[in-house]
């Protein structure tokens, strides 16, 4: 609603009063207008920006401070899909980035606390269970899947209590962080106690989550980022990865040959599942570098490995303003001299001109096919039991956030006992739900409910044996001691030094790049073979056959891995200072990589042909016998 005095004014001042004041950096008048509360603080201007987005893009710090203090949403995206924080980084203004980052973290905490009662109600209604979520990483590039570790999340749910055990903690300084941790969520009436149990250090960090009684200033003070955190953002590219599913379609996978094809089903952890393929899934990665110095831009380019050069990725580079010639510059925030009348006129076409620092953007797009294994008879409910847990984990875990984005689609009926979704351009994540209520492997803290261990009357022996999982895993009883702090552990408050857990994709993206290189320095040169086998420069990774033989052979202390037969021996180092071998040319590296992929593909085709011939032979024999 626009106030009477604003509606009486003509032009942009009347239609977009907050935006107009932001444009002219009149922060004192903006404060009065916002305090009056008669204008929507999230109103969009003709270019798809909120007042906060416009203030950030223009670098008007005091206007941004006023809007943030009155609750402007930091998480909103503009028409181009960029957040307020990403636009703040583009300005290179350290104080502005620090301010926006502080309020972003504060608003996340408030939203998380406000959602506690809803989450508690969902947990209260859901049936108790124990389940294991196994994360595996796969890739179409041979041997690359080993660059990401696998992990099994163990989940206990009892009443309003939840516990998740993990060994994969996250990423810090471009490396994968491992440890033995438990996260306990213990619900109360309108609040919850959260414990992070560090089993390696025998320390328990506790925190009470409740929006009521929380002091706003204390929460804001706790969200204050360090200068190091701000500088790390200003010296790294802005990276965002999106899973575009607007054109997604699900189809049943087929099996068999020619006229003998049928809909595919597979057994997954004792459950018969229908296999679906999801097509038209696009993974879009956008990278902005206009805020980086030439030195840091050089580092980013140096991180590009030969592997990234031949991947099947459509890559577009956009220079400043996508090629628009900038002939006059009023300021860094308005390099193409756009006037207020032009900006606020919805009928005026700006073309490639825009506000803010000229954007240097790289966009990578690749199409993927996701897979689903759905069981209609599974005891777990995706919406009632699993979704609340994924929502809780997605707050601070980028992998769970992507899983949540996928399962919120309109999936075919059934529980997804296994899901394979793209995470990055060369990596898929395969998530498998198993050991429900400790039915596959006993869990000391879990025992089956007496009512769930007896098959229903009237069931014959064959049906009992074939559906043992579904009959004996319907319920369980979980020991209350699981949700208590272990004896002998030190108890500490919630304030502690910890790596920032950010659900942005940039740290994860860099961790994967670093794993691909796995060299002592980002300047080390790696060959295609080293990238594919994840070996350090100068080493000789063994062939696929050698690896297979090595698994079956007893361990030998001094075993030296042999180079693959199809790869020519690299030249010896030319001197004591040489850091490793280098192949003769990029063309040779590319040829070797494609050779390796072709061998892998040929092996898959050979196995498929062999299976089809065997099936055809069996069918012919069966027809002959008849």
UniProtKB/Swiss-Prot annotation:
Keywords: Acetylation, ANK repeat, Cell membrane, Endosome, Membrane, Repeat
Residue(s) carrying N-acetylmethionine: 1
Main localization (coarse): membrane
One Gene Ontology CC term in the entry: perinuclear region of cytoplasm
Top-level taxon of the source organism: Eukaryota
Molecular function terms, GO-annotated: ubiquitin-modified protein reader activity
Pfam family, one: ANKRD13_C
A biological-process GO annotation: negative regulation of receptor internalization
InterPro entries, A to Z: ANKRD13 (IPR021832), ANKRD13_C (IPR055285), Ankyrin_rpt (IPR002110), Ankyrin_rpt-contain_sf (IPR036770), UIM_dom (IPR003903)
Residue stretches making up the UIM domain: 503-522, 585-604, 610-626
Keyword Cell membrane: yes
Stretches the record annotates as Disordered: 442-474, 534-590, 595-614
Extent of Pro residues compositional bias: 554-573
Assembly with partners or alone: Interacts with EGFR (ubiquitinated); the interaction is direct and may regulate EGFR internalization.
Function of the molecule: Ubiquitin-binding protein that specifically recognizes and binds 'Lys-63'-linked ubiquitin. Does not bind 'Lys-48'-linked ubiquitin. Positively regulates the internalization of ligand-activated EGFR by binding to the Ub moiety of ubiquitinated EGFR at the cell membrane.
Protein name: Ankyrin repeat domain-containing protein 13B
Protein's organism: Homo sapiens
